[in-house]
């Protein structure tokens, strides 16, 4: 009976996540910024062997069923790194069938005490569901309000377009979550690196004024980041 219960629980999580993906994909408000499909095309599987242009990759001339299926999310994840986080992406570059469809998916694992640094995805929504463990999810609004909560298996979250957010493992075992972003190849802007690892560097005077800190502190912070 316990085995049947586990299967039922997993299927429930998968169904919830599929509903989430459908919502992101079909809601014009959420997916329109990333939707680049020609209205006269059913799809445009990217030809990654071709040279991309400003409009992206051209469509493959020959398409098979295999172009619309992907197993890469199941690859084992290793969180033995300084950030304690690892992810398998299903995006335009790993799954060319997503080209122009305005969606990508990620299998994410976070070690106990690990955090995905504060970051944003300009112009697009992110949402996800926890598969295992306890995850602290938070995002900041443009009026400096923090919304956050610790969530567990089967719980979902959503990050409004472009807002700074983070995820962290606050449990005692590795956590795992599936996330979906409303872009086939979303950009990511990490807050610490954006401020401390630019080339050329932001003048110390600017950061001293922003953080109310001295030059020694700013230089110490810079030393911990590379572009």
Swiss-Prot record:
Location in or out of the cell: Secreted, Extracellular space, Apoplast
Main location group: secreted
Positions annotated as glycosylated: 78, 143
A Pfam family reported for this protein in Swiss-Prot or TrEMBL: Cupin_1
SMART domains for the chain: Cupin_1 (SM00835)
Superkingdom per UniProt: Eukaryota
Domain Cupin type-1: start-end pairs: 71-219
Record-given protein name: Germin-like protein subfamily T member 3
Task of the protein: May play a role in plant defense. Probably has no oxalate oxidase activity even if the active site is conserved.
Cysteines engaged in disulfide bonds, as pairs: 44-59
